[in-house]
C-alpha cells in the first residue's frame, strides 16, 4: 500500500499477522472494537497500549485486565494529556495549589450518543487529567449531570478533594465556544 511504502511500515492483512510481527501494539480504534482487538492481541502474546476507554463496559474491561495478568503481559490504557509537555509542567507546580479546575467546553456537541457514551468517550479525559495532575488520591465530593430529553449529555461538573487541594471538572456540550482550560 502507498502509505505503508512511504512510511516504510510493513503491511499486515490481519490482526493475527500484525500480532505475529510485533512485541507491542498501540490500539486506536472504535471503542466498540476494543474488547475484540485487545483480547486477540493479548491471546497472541502481544503487550498492548489502548486508547481510552479500555472497553465499552466494566465487565469487558475486567476480563481484559484478567487476561493480561494471566498471560503476564502489559496492558496500558493511554490518556494523551498525560504526555503533553504543558500538563507535565503544571503537574510539577501543583504542590502549593489550593484549587485546580479543568474545563472542556464545546459549542455544539450534544448527541448523537447518550450520557454514558459521552462520559466514557469525552468527559473521562477531563476527569482523568485533573485526577492525574492532583496525584490520583482524590475523593469525589459531589457533582451534577444534566441531559436533554433524549438522554444526551448537556453538562457535567464534579468536585473532588485531594487533601487540601480542591478539584473541579466541568464540561458543557452546548457552550458559546470551543475551549479547554486548566487553572491552578
Regions found by a protein language model. Give the residues of each.
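Short loop/edge segments at beta-strand edges and connector loops
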Residues: 13, 29, 50, 77-79, ...
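Rossmann-like dinucleotide-binding domain that binds NAD(P)(H)
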Residues: 108-179
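Beta-loop-alpha module in the N-terminal Rossmann-like domain of NAD(P)-dependent dehydrogenases
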Residues: 7-49, 53-65
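Active-site phosphate/pyrophosphate- and oxyanion-stabilizing loops and adjacent acidic/basic residues
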Residues: 16, 88, 92, 127-131
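A contiguous active-site-proximal alpha/beta segment in oxidoreductase catalytic domains
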Residues: 32, 55-111
Amino acid at each position: 500500500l502507498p502509505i505503508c511504502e512511504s512510511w516504510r511500515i510493513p503491511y499486515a492483512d490481519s490482526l493475527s499477522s500484525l500480532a505475529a510481527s510485533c512485541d507491542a501494539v498501540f490500539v486506536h480504534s472504535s471503542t466498540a472494537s476494543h474488547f475484540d482487538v485487545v483480547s486477540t492481541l493479548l491471546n497472541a502474546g502481544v503487550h498492548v497500549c489502548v486508547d481510552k476507554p479500555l472497553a465499552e463496559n466494566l465487565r469487558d474491561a475486567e476480563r481484559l485486565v484478567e487476561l493480561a495478568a494471566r498471560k503476564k503481559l502489559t496492558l496500558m490504557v493511554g490518556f494523551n494529556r498525560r504526555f503533553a509537555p504543558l500538563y507535565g509542567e503544571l503537574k510539577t507546580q501543583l504542590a502549593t495549589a489550593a484549587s485546580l479546575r479543568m474545563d472542556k467546553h464545546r459549542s455544539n456537541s450534544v448527541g448523537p450518543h447518550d450520557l454514558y457514551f459521552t462520559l466514557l468517550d469525552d468527559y473521562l479525559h477531563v476527569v482523568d487529567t485533573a485526577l492525574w495532575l492532583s496525584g490520583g488520591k482524590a475523593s469525589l465530593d459531589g457533582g451534577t449531570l444534566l441531559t436533554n430529553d433524549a438522554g444526551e449529555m448537556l453538562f457535567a461538573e464534579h468536585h473532588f478533594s485531594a487533601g487540601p487541594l480542591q478539584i473541579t471538572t466541568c464540561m458543557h456540550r452546548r457552550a458559546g465556544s470551543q475551549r479547554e482550560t486548566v487553572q491552578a
